[in-house]
Amino acid sequence: FPVAKARALSLADADVDVGDLERFSRFIAAQRGDAPALVGGYGEDRRIYAKSSLFDGMGEPRTIHLGVDVWTEAGTPLRAPLDAEVHSYQVNDNFGDYGGTIILAHDGFHTLWGHLAHRSLDGLREGQAIAAGETFAWLGGPAENGGWPPHLHLQRIDDLLGNRGDFPGVAPRSERDRWLALCPDPRGLLV
């Protein structure tokens, strides 16, 4: 996975519309330049979400990003950072959602891998063992990843709260501390 030479990216103050895929993709490409990937976003208060009805629910807008994003090419293979087993998986196919999603169970926590190619879910089964270093998924393009420029949303989750195949990736500002405690920084899992 191309994170060793990646550039840092903050979307905290980015002036892009998440509903305008073409403009958002140009912004990401310009930020990336010749780097293999862009990495960042954990704990950011992203005003780009406040501009979108996708993240406002029925009350306070959700703007606190709970995972780390790795912006790179569709089709990029993903390898498990640690031994795991498949907890759950599904296609979350609403616009702005995760698209292909896999949740892995590790020793004492889970990881959510979002914006995946749908083929990543082919042949998976709950309880399936995934060895550290094993390729288990691929990044999806906009047609299958929720309508985003290609990227991985990686989120560590200490308690799934009963969820299967999905979990909030963005939280309201007023609940920032609670959600970040539940979803610690996953950057150490990037390999």
Regions found by a protein language model. Name each.
Residues 32-34, 58-94:
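Short, glycine/small-residue-enriched coil/turn segments at secondary-structure junctions
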Residues 74-77, 120, 126:
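Short, conserved secondary-structure segments in the cores of folded domains
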Residues 2, 122-134, 138-144, 148-191:
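Acidic, glycine-rich catalytic/binding loops that coordinate metals and/or anionic ligands
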Residues 46-66, 92-109, 145:
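Gly/Ser-enriched beta-turn/beta-hairpin loop segments
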Residues 65, 106, 115, 151-153:
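Histidine-centered active-site/metal-ligand motif
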